[in-house]
Amino acid sequence: MYKRQALDNAGIVNFGYDRIAYADVKGVKVALIGTYMLAEGLDIKDEMVANINTAKSEGAQIIVVFTHWGIEKETVPGTDQVELGHAAIDAGATLVVGSHPHVIQGYEKYNGRYIVYSLGNFCFGGNKNPSDKDCMIFQQTFTVTGNDVASDDAINVIPCSISSSSSSNNYQPTPAEGDEADRILA
């Protein structure tokens, strides 16, 4: 609770577990919902769907679900990730973004919405020289007209490295270019 209070005191929007964050972005109400799917026996689907329904009832026009899921170093999402991602979209999430595996797991378009399974590490201080420095930035534009949200299919995926140095982690994420960018996105 101390961390939440510190973030609140600093005016930093935070969310997760039992807290949905709302932000006004150019007059559009955006809901940010956090979930955690790593503890054995922890079924978060019902809580996540309830949070999505709460966000909708509170007038959120865009609902982004961030979930901490997956098995470390696995480059392919597990069936539990796919099922939960699909459930989030089916419940009304506009976008699902995952983290935890420490590697890129790619993304899919499901029922007209994107699920990004894992972005990789991006800015990671847990290892001075991780063997996999690949990560990506996922950008998507939404057009809101009244209560209708249209996603722009012209997404932008930017391949990156968590470091500008190949021999160590200097904590300076850097966009990749050329063959390196192609390799990361392959």
What does each model-found stretch correspond to?
Residues 3-186:
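Acidic, metal/ion-coordinating pockets
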